[in-house]
Amino acid sequence: MTKNHILGLDIAQNSAVTQLDRADGTKCWRGTLPTSQAGWQQLEKILAEHGARLPDTLVLLEATGVYHLPWAERLHQAGAEVYVLNPLLAARLQSAANALREHKTDSVDVHRVCEIGRLYAAELARFRYQPEPARQGLKQLDHARRKLRATLTNLKKSVQSHLELVFPALLKAKIGPCTARASAILEKAPTAGAWRALPEAERQKLAGVKQADLDQACADTLADEALAQACAPAVHALLSAQQALAEQLRRCDAQIAPRLPRERVALITSLPGFGERTAAVMATYLPASFEGWGPRKKIVPRVQALFGLDPRLRQSGKWTGKVKISKRGIGAGRTALFQAAFCSLSHDEEMAAYYALLRTGDGRGRRSKTHKEAMVDVMRKQVRRLVAVLCANQPYGKKSHKAA
């Protein structure tokens, strides 16, 4: 259907700079709307004043964190054809008027968005907005989990750093500072002096096979007892926060599990190297209908690009730059693919042999690759296997997926 108007929105937390153009590029209106019901009602009034109906309007938004989602949902429900553009695309498709000056204002941005819609509407199909509340909720949970995981990792590092001052003997005895054994010891005796003051039987109960090592480390330590006692409350505070965050992470995992597409997760975990966690990430970020993107040979490069594994070419005349992965896609998926590729080297003889071949060269003039280059190739091979398994809807088997 031919659209009569183009509506562009550059959305921030509390406002949306909006421009309405006719299909030929003539500007009808530009202004700022609040991100509220009042802003929506004002938009409806403006559209009516200029004879624009949302079903006959091409709407383009620039993806801005999560701020664009309420607008995209409301516009979609009102019958508009909504496209959510990658900010990098919007930034690089400069308008002719601003290409040399490179001004950066909200008005310039929203004008550029409208111009993209006018010039490239036929090529924007992959940016068409489709409401998927359940999938978006799963993405938000995964994002929350990654934040919790990162915070927990930083807390564990902080605990170890504090123990270097308070109870270095615990680390010297090779007792993991984040283990249940360390927690029990620190609860009863947070310093070397407090440990030596405990009865032999209690020390044996707390440290087990590590008692002798810890006793010796406490005897050899240079830590000042008064200073250690003064700083011990900081260790207890960090340990309490660590335990609370670990429990919160477990609850987050429990919320994610029932929301995952179990059949897809089962297929992905059949691949060597993929576990429950990495399979969950891939199932979360792979579009539900990606199998319909075309033949498998076309799907694979598109999935690679989705996770930023596609090569970024740099050539000009006789000069050839170093080819690197683009890293433009979904970072969480790329991390999961790296973890799966790394694990596959230990659990899949075929993949280990493939990695070894990449590192040594094939003996026919093809150069050997560095570890990083070889790992990227292994990640791409995992993508080929992933696509083969999901498109065939069958668990992985060497005989049935030789093409991967």
Please annotate each region the language model reported:
Residues 1-404:
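A detector of single, family-specific signature residues
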